[in-house]
């Protein structure tokens, strides 16, 4: 069966992502996620054992990364799987690369000595995913996001929310099903509206409670509510955090943020009112900044204003407005 499958799919066209207008770090994943193949549980088991299959281990949600000669995700073969404890949960299917090579991620947090697995790849170590994402190739950061978010979901949702029975992973990790009540559970993605509010040559930015007594400011943001359009979520969050009414909401771009599993929906919005009425339970400070001050901060030449770095969608929303790019 496996030989027949590989022969039939050897020349299958690979769907390369080339339609993204603005690709952030943690986006740009080029894998074909193999929706058809992941529905065949027996095929998945056989794919894991293929000689060319590649696995990306994570230890406490830190991916294995190789630093020499260039930073990249460190993929290894499947031989180490036989020694994994049962609580590791098994490999989760990520998809196929352009050569139709299957790729999986696996959580090895239950392993007592992860250095032995790290040693299976030359010059590799388990690293913080956020730090590694700025150094590895762009499309690999998208793979990292997919793998980290999925493994974290499995670790946090082992038990059925209906009856409490331990559930089982299916579809290569894209579903858990309860063996007792047959309830199906799917990985969650939490949508977040993040927006830069502007009026002429000024924009509004805020400082959260975690950043108090610093010069760090960023876009306003908040989780979307159920039954809420993106534009409505933007307006609500701006009103809640800054007390400002807005109009002319424009979509800019989006960014997966796998800490743990958010989708940042980036927008720009024009202020309809300008008086700030900040919510002190959410924010330390909210204020207007001039375009000139923002441009200096983007060049790291403004000691009174620090902005998010390029890893974050907030940086690109701010930069887009400051440079008249929207």
Locate each region found by the language model.
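Short acidic-glycine loop/turn motifs at beta-strand connectors
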Residues: 97-100, 199-201, 273
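Short Pro/Gly-enriched beta-strand edge/turn motifs at strand-loop
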Residues: 75-78, 175-180, 249
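Nudix hydrolase/Nudix homology domain
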Residues: 2-157, 168, 212-217, 279-326
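A short, glycine/Asx- and small/polar-enriched loop/turn
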Residues: 259-264
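Cys/His-rich short segments
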Residues: 145-200
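N-terminal strand-loop-strand
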Residues: 176-218, 223-224, 245-246, 269
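Solvent-exposed residues in well-ordered beta-strands and their adjoining turns
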Residues: 270-272, 289-290
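The catalytic Nudix box helix
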Residues: 218-253, 267, 273-275
């Amino acid at each position: 069966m496996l030989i027949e499958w590989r022969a039939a799919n050897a020349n299958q066209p690979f769907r390369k992502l080339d339609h993204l207008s603005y690709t952030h770090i943690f986006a740009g994943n080029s894998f074909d996620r193999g929706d058809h193949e992941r529905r065949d549980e027996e095929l998945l088991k056989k794919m894991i054992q293929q000689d060319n299959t590649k696995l990306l281990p994570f230890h406490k949600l830190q991916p294995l990364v190789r630093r020499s000669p260039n930073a990249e995700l460190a993929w290894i073969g499947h031989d180490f799987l036989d020694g994994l404890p049962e609580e590791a949960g098994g490999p989760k299917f990520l998809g196929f690369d352009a050569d139709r090579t299957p790729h999986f991620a696996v959580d090895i947090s239950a392993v007592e000595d992860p250095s032995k697995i790290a040693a299976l790849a030359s010059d590799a170590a388990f690293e913080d995913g956020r730090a590694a994402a700025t150094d590895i190739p762009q499309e690999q950061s998208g793979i990292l996001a997919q793998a980290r978010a999925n493994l974290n979901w499995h670790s946090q949702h082992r038990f059925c929310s209906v009856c409490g029975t331990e559930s089982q992973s299916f579809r290569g990790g894209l579903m858990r099903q309860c063996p007792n009540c047959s309830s199906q559970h799917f990985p969650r993605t939490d949508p977040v509206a993040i927006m830069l509010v502007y009026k002429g040559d000024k924009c509004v930015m805020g400082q959260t409670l975690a950043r108090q007594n610093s010069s760090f400011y960023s876009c306003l943001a908040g989780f979307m509510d159920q039954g809420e359009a993106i534009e409505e979520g933007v307006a609500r969050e701006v009103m809640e955090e800054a007390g400002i009414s807005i109009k002319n909401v424009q979509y800019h771009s989006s960014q997966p943020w796998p800490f743990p599993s958010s989708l940042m929906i980036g927008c720009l919005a024009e202020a309809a009112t300008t008086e700030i009425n900040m919510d002190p339970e959410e924010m330390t400070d909210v204020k207007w900044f001039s375009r000139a001050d923002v441009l200096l901060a983007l060049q790291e030449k403004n000691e009174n204003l620090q902005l998010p770095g390029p890893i974050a969608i907030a940086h690109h929303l701010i930069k887009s407005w400051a440079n008249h790019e929207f």
